[in-house]
Amino acid sequence: MFQTFISRHNSNFFSDKLVASSVTPASLAPVLQTPKATSSTLYFDSLTVNAGNGGFLHCIQMDTSVNAANQVVSVGADIAFDADPKFFACLVRFESSSVPTTLPTAYDVYPLNGRHDGGYYTVKDCVTIDVLPRTPGNNVYVGFMVWSNFTATKCRGLVSLNQVIKVIICLQPLK
């Protein structure tokens, strides 16, 4: 099934500014921020990315009270690095019984259709995610993750995640 990017985000008009000033990529990727919301926009102006092989991510907690096992998550991101790292960006789905600070060892990866141009990366995409926990009592989280063999660099940009809960029906005029 082909999905197009859902451009109407229900996120706040203002974005959250990242509090952390630096991050060290790791195999258990550190979580930059996890709001208890189904929609979040994170802005980071001058994030120092320390040298390391691994990643970091921004995630949201999924609303599991909806009457569907699968929900669409849309992502819009525009990030830039001062250096020109070759990196992989994706959505990840994982479960945790508490607010995560790092990516757990068990997670699902969803590739994104983004554009990498030099030190810039832009993506507008959406993915259908299983929102029901596989382990009773866990919460489901979805995050935008950047993974690379980083050299020390600065990073700036905006990442917007949105769980699409509303169904929008578009009627076309009769011909």
From Swiss-Prot:
Positions in coiled-coil regions: none
Alphabetical GO biological process terms: symbiont entry into host cell; symbiont-mediated perturbation of host process; virion attachment to host cell
Pfam families: Phage_G
Top-level taxon of the source organism: Viruses
UniProt key word Thylakoid: no
A single Gene Ontology CC term: viral capsid
Key words of the record: Capsid protein, Host-virus interaction, Viral attachment to host cell, Viral genome ejection through host cell envelope, Viral penetration into host cytoplasm, Virion, Virus entry into host cell
Compartments it resides in: Virion
Biological role stated in the UniProt entry: Attaches the circulating virion to the bacterial lipopolysaccharides which serve as receptor for the virus. Determines the phage host-range. Probably triggers with protein H the injection of the phage DNA into the host cytoplasm upon conformational changes induced by the interaction with host lipopolysaccharides.
Family, as annotated: Belongs to the microvirus G protein family.
Assembly notes: The virion is composed of 60 copies each of the F, G, and J proteins, and 12 copies of the H protein. There are 12 spikes which are each composed of 5 G and one H proteins.
Name this protein carries in UniProt: Major spike protein G
Lineage per the UniProt record: Viruses, Monodnaviria, Sangervirae, Phixviricota, Malgrandaviricetes
